[in-house]
């Protein structure tokens, strides 16, 4: 058995050596802690001081006017300045101190003239230039990013701010059902082969679950562990009716119907996913009257029908902050009063480091446009409770997602020639960076996955029946304990 985290004098930090994950050789902290409260205070205080220069209106009118006018510029200035001036969260760890040229080859002369030697390149400029072929990396992408603090600067750039102002903010404000369908179609209908080349045969685009940290379980094992866990938490029985909202390629729907003989319905906006899932159900010998994949918005389901069990795995991020409460209320209305909801959602930590912010903006631009509802756990819980749900259990699966992403990363590299032949170098590079950076971000807490088990907050709900499925309270001691008398 491998040991727990041990101190490595070469990097000045504790490191792990667990077979289940891609272990961090240099688990160093980044610069700054992003605080929404601090930003809000600055945005609110600046117009207060400026009111003295607008003497022709009442204080309230002047303040509101200045708040509207200065809010966005102040936010931009805050991000630009703080990302450059903030210190590392903890000043520990030993960087290699190598030159930029040891990590990459900069092919663009103008870029090379500005960034060389010990001059760190902004991370956004690096990945954009890499996608465009202006930069080639030396060695493995994941290895390169493990030492990113030695060669990259995690600062907000004008290009990032332009994206925030012209794309991200309008998406958050005007997020619509039509936008969801367009973005889902663009991403998930790119080609089943594209997704299979990293997702593998299970075709599950959500986090798997580790069961043994000292064993490198296959991607299929991680996903099978997750399917079993979700169905256990749902307490599936033959008489159940299951709804999978955002069912992907139908693997969970098929698994539930095949193993628990329940009636399972999956909904997706993707044409490719619906066709693939329908075929998967048939290929597994499940009768069409017991399982089906519908290509439709779940809000278009028959409002009079209720489901005894509902599951949604990493779909809610795409709903958008503006429509989140409405989405959860719709889910509430679809669930029977004694039903169970398993709600798995990707999220972030409440106090970001600036590298988390820059990674999040990359993800929104290149991988999951419109997925603006990846929020902190406390925010998600608050929204669920406001919708009328009560939490039974929460599991934080960030490191499990890192393990899953690492398997996806390995698959993507294995299928490089196929990707290049059909989709080209740029798409290969974008996904290589996405997968490698996400392995790290999920492992170190910048992003995570929350698996939440819920039911309606009603007096008549029989909470005692949930105890057998509450996995985290059932333990097997490593040795027989000596009891206190």
Residue ranges and their predicted role:
Residues 325-337:
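A short glycine-rich, Lys/Arg-flanked "PGG" loop and its adjoining helix->strand segment in the class I
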Residues 238-248:
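Conserved class I S-adenosyl-L-methionine
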Residues 338-346:
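Conserved beta-strand signature within the Rossmann-like core of class I S-adenosyl-L-methionine
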């Amino acid at each position: 058995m491998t040991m727990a985290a041990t101190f490595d004098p070469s990097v000045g930090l504790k490191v792990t050596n667990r077979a289940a994950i891609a272990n961090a050789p240099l688990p160093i902290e980044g610069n700054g802690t992003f605080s929404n409260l601090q930003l809000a205070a600055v945005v609110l205080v600046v117009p207060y001081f400026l009111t003295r220069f607008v003497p022709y209106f009442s204080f309230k009118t002047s303040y509101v006017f200045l708040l509207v006018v200065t809010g966005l510029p102040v936010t931009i200035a805050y991000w630009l300045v703080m990302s450059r001036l903030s210190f590392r969260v903890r000043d520990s760890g030993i960087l290699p101190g190598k030159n930029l040229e040891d990590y990459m080859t900069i092919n663009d002369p103008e870029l090379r003239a500005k960034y060389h030697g010990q001059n760190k390149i902004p991370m956004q400029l690096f990945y954009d230039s890499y996608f465009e072929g202006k930069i080639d990396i030396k060695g493995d992408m994941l290895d390169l990013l493990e030492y990113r603090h030695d060669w990259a600067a995690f600062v907000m750039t004008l290009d990032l701010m332009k994206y925030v102002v012209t794309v991200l903010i309008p998406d958050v404000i005007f997020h619509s059902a039509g936008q969801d369908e367009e973005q889902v179609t663009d991403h998930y209908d790119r080609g089943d082969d594209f997704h299979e080349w990293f997702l593998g045969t299970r075709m599950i685009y959500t986090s798997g679950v580790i069961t043994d940290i000292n064993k490198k379980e296959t991607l299929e094992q991680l996903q099978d562990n997750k399917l079993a866990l979700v169905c256990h938490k749902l307490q599936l029985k033959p008489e159940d009716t299951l709804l999978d909202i955002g069912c992907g390629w139908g693997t969970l729907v098929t698994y539930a119907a095949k193993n628990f003989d329940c009636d399972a319905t999956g909904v997706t906006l993707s044409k490719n996913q619906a066709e693939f899932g329908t075929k998967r159900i048939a290929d597994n010998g499940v009768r069409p009257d017991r399982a089906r994949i519908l290509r439709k918005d779940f809000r278009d389901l028959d409002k009079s029908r209720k489901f005894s069990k509902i599951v949604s795995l990493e779909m809610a991020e795409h709903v958008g902050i503006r429509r989140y409460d409405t989405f959860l209320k719709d889910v509430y209305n679809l669930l029977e009063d004694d039903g169970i909801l398993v709600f798995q959602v990707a999220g972030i930590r409440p106090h970001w480091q600036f590298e988390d912010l820059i990674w999040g903006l990359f993800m929104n631009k290149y991988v999951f446009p419109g997925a603006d509802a990846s929020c902190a756990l406390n925010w998600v819980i608050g929204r669920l409770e406001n919708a009328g749900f009560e939490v039974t259990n929460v599991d934080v699966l960030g490191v499990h997602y890192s393990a899953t992403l690492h398997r996806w990363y390995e698959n993507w590299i294995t299928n490089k020639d196929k990707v290049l032949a059909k989709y080209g170098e740029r798409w290969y590079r974008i996904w290589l960076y996405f997968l490698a950076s996400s392995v790290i971000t999920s492992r170190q807490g910048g992003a995570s996955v929350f698996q939440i088990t819920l039911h309606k907050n009603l007096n008549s709900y029989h909470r005692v029946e949930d105890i057998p499925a509450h996995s985290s309270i059932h333990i097997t001691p490593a040795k027989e304990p000596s009891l206190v008398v």
